[in-house]
Amino acid sequence: MAAEIILINPPPLNWREKHDALNHPHLGLAYLSAYLRQNNFECQPIDAKFERMNLEELGKAIKKYRPILVGITAMTHEIGQAAQVARLVKELFPEVKTVLGGAHATALPQETLRQFPEFDMAIVGEGEITLLELVKTLIQRGELSKIAGLAFRPSSDAIILNNCRQPIQNLDSLPFPAWNLFPPSQTYSLITTRGCPFRCKFCMRVSGNQPRKRSYQNVLEEFKMDINKYGAGQILVEDESFGLDRKQAYPFLDALADSGLNKKVKWVTQTRVDLVDEEFFQKLKAAGCAWVGFGVESGNEKILKEIGKGITLKKVEESISLAKKTGLQTGSYFIIGHPYETKQTAWDTINFAAKLNTTTVAFGIMVPYPGTEIYSMALRGEGGYRIISSDWADFNKTIGASLELETLSRKELEKLQLLAYFVFYFKNWRFWDFFKLLL
């Protein structure tokens, strides 16, 4: 089969990750595939995680094609799986080039190429234009050194990082995600903006600090496509902070309500507590939004200030109360293991989360993701941190074990995480919700 480029989301690492894997195809691969096809290159994405493939099954899928380039995306904890995929590609097609993209490659491009010789190149930041230029350069046998946003290995003992690539400004110029190249799904994701202006110490910002927005008309057309062409039953609006620009969000929400699409699909999103008010929630509700999530992170004011979150507990309570009043389901996200965290501050978080009693909740253990200020602090031993693993697979907030604090051992952090769920559900008499969590 003809496919000049194959783009891969690696298989799940283990049964737990297979169970927890997302129930919708990868948005980044869909954007990249659409962009390459718009520019007349045959591209085939393989979302091994979404399809719950193992490595052997992925190998059979890859062998159907004759690529000149294989791209692999990976978060930090997935980098080992991505390297396994790259090794598999080299076994099947020794002459084919492999390129890594995603958060880990963006944060540590040179270090990653040094650690994993299976990758020939790494893309730093947004991938559409860089990947297209890479494909053209490989076909024309041009110079890789001229491609902004690329790291590559010109020889076995050298690694070059080219100049940075500026973020795409006109997001409306990008084609809609190529969902037709993936197996059918009931759920699809989209974004209305790229980039985040906030500077939380724990967060990776692959798309940079400069917010760039799509026109509301462009987003509305994608909504229509997902529903009418692909039969979406649920849409995830995956902006880091939906509603960052009211001048964009309000016309979109009004148009969505007027279009009747709000009655055809359930959609969810996430935002910040300091970006919302009652009018905002009313427009969300009228536009068909069913659930809105908030990154609360901590139930302690000093910790919130330490991590640069820029919110207060009072504002958290006010915003979530307003969302509930409007009839929206709510979600809250918390982290245990902030800089200088103690057992008392962790319990402040647990009790505050229970008090909020959102529809859903998630408690993660802090991970020092490369590219974040937390990572730099942990490397320097600041914040009371100790990195206790050099295995990137442990850099997973749900099931990993990458760091501990002088005041809280890894076992204590894990115990607090479990207790957080127990207290949240049992204190609110939500016993069945707790047991569903264990299934």
At which residue positions do the language-model features occur?
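C-terminal accessory regions of radical SAM enzymes
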Residues: 2-15, 151, 329, 347, ...
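Glycine-rich beta-alpha loop elements in corrinoid/cobalamin-binding modules
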Residues: 4, 35-164, 168, 365-367, ...
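Hydrophobic/aromatic residues located in beta-strands of well-ordered beta-sheets
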Residues: 5, 98, 147-148, 235, ...
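N-terminal [4Fe-4S]-dependent radical SAM core
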Residues: 5-6, 11-18, 144-147, 151-192
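Glycine- and acidic-residue-enriched helix-capping/strand-helix junction motifs
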Residues: 16-29
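Radical SAM [4Fe-4S] cluster-binding motif and immediate context
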Residues: 24, 172-333, 351
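Proline-aspartate-enriched helix->loop->beta-strand connector
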Residues: 66-70, 232, 358
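Catalytic cores of alpha/beta
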Residues: 109-115, 280, 340-355
